[in-house]
Amino acid sequence: MSNSMTFQGVVEKGIGLGKKLGFPTFNLHVEPLPELAHGVYAVRARLGDASHGTGEVWHDALMHFGPKPTVSMESVFCEVYFLKFPEGLEIHELEVEVLGKLRDVMKFVGLDALVEQMKEDERVAVENYFRK
């Protein structure tokens, strides 16, 4: 996996909104923040840091990087949603590889519109990045 940006982050507890909307995310604390434009990205992520032998399998995922204007949260957030992920694992750290940007951060009129766009983001990512 070369010529792409990778970074690591520590998983922090969020407010649970992604899970409530059907898109459970891992909220990452990343320092320093990657030099990345705010937006939604197709990524691959794995548990922990490969250099420590804690994660061997890359998982297809989406990442939101930036503020969350629909819910009036203006700080920069880094959230990772796995398309398929085994349940029940306790995750403390993720390594993320950025594959490509899907779209800019947008403000939606409500949560229903946000969910519809998230479904579309997943469809576009699968078609353009994860099709096998």
Where are these regions (language model features)?
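Phosphate/ribose-recognition catalytic cores of enzymes acting on nucleotide-derived substrates
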Residues: 2-132
